[in-house]
């Protein structure tokens, strides 16, 4: 029987399945951070259980680390306690930890792929909703809750029901300057923020194959923002070339054998999906969200929509509420909307290619008066690479702040946050009310678009910036 990529990955990991019971899946990799793990380790301790597979468990600090200092006390008492607990727990249970002073420390979904922890064909979990990022490698990756974190630590397995399948095909080639962020925002604009609920999404089509691994990670990172359980891109030569030579990747003949298997991780011809969505890449312009969920998104050259134009009463009410919160009026061109802050970072867009794209816009320009712009690399290796290329100097000369790695203003768990009423052009993944700070207003954009907003003081079409 013809199978989708998701079905192949799921079936290959079923440990046990009884009639009328939820299947038990084997978990290949478990990524851990300081926020969702303390109670899980406490549970192990209370029952006298070890970590079943410490060699398949990797930890880092990211959510509430300071991006201005490596001082563990810098972001308040709760942050300090969570980080100290992670140090204690990893030491006690034999888990490898990339702490504040480790050169590999960074956002968990940046660290995993760049260290070769993430490989095609794997099941990967983390107590974090954006674990879907790792699906870019053709791995089944999804977020779990703290009780499930404990279960995986104890057993290296997890009960998981089968999801429905969705194919999202982006046909043709994207125009110059159009990034994975624009593509995924356009997709969510079409499906809505709940369009993928109950599904695992496979992204395919020429525009997807053209993306680098970093672009594919951006794409899969935001699968969760359309309500999907996970996002997938089938592995190909782009994937294999990225993985080869990384710290935890197979070496020599083992790598060749792995690639031979990874090449089978494609959806079979004739396999059926529960839902199919198609977009034309050439129709996608730079995207900017205007509301309070990622599905409320338009092209940069469009006007803010009028809630009255929505036929669905629920959508209309949502749009009215969003515009009130965002302090926007219908009919205003997006390019006339001024911004206060810019955040370039997060597990969506903090990799080296993202920083290069932003630096290209920043080079030779200055951050607009009254705008604060932060650049937060996703990990120690990304920061080191950017500095080796001189990107930090470009940003600093333009008036951007060059920070240490961490999740930062994406979710405002450290000291990087918006004040009430402040408007931010952000490369992160969520524009919910209060996400970047109480009363803060978030617009999601690509790194180049964020840099353009920083230097112009308002949203600007990067296609017009020479």
Swiss-Prot record:
Record keyword Iron present: yes
Keywords annotated in UniProt: 4Fe-4S, Amino-acid biosynthesis, Branched-chain amino acid biosynthesis, Iron, Iron-sulfur, Leucine biosynthesis, Lyase, Metal-binding
Chemical reaction(s) catalysed: (2R,3S)-3-isopropylmalate = (2S)-2-isopropylmalate
EC number: 4.2.1.33
The keyword Cell cycle appears for this protein: no
Note on cofactor: Binds 1 [4Fe-4S] cluster per subunit.
Cofactor: [4Fe-4S] cluster
Pfam families: Aconitase
Enzyme class, first EC level, given as a word: lyase
Positions that bind [4Fe-4S] cluster: 347, 407, 410
Lineage: superkingdom: Bacteria
InterPro entries noted in UniProt: 3-IsopropMal_deHydase_lsu, Acnase/IPM_dHydase_lsu_aba_1/3, Acoase/IPM_deHydtase_lsu_aba, Aconitase_4Fe-4S_BS, Aconitase_4Fe-4S_dom, IPM_dehydratase_rel_enz, IPMI_cat
GO molecular function, one term: metal ion binding
GO biological process: L-leucine biosynthetic process
Known pathway: Amino-acid biosynthesis; L-leucine biosynthesis; L-leucine from 3-methyl-2-oxobutanoate: step 2/4
Entry function: Catalyzes the isomerization between 2-isopropylmalate and 3-isopropylmalate, via the formation of 2-isopropylmaleate.
Assembly description: Heterodimer of LeuC and LeuD.
Protein family according to the UniProt entry: Belongs to the aconitase/IPM isomerase family. LeuC type 1 subfamily.
Protein's name according to its UniProt entry: 3-isopropylmalate dehydratase large subunit
Native source organism of the sequence: Escherichia fergusonii (strain ATCC 35469 / DSM 13698 / CCUG 18766 / IAM 14443 / JCM 21226 / LMG 7866 / NBRC 102419 / NCTC 12128 / CDC 0568-73)
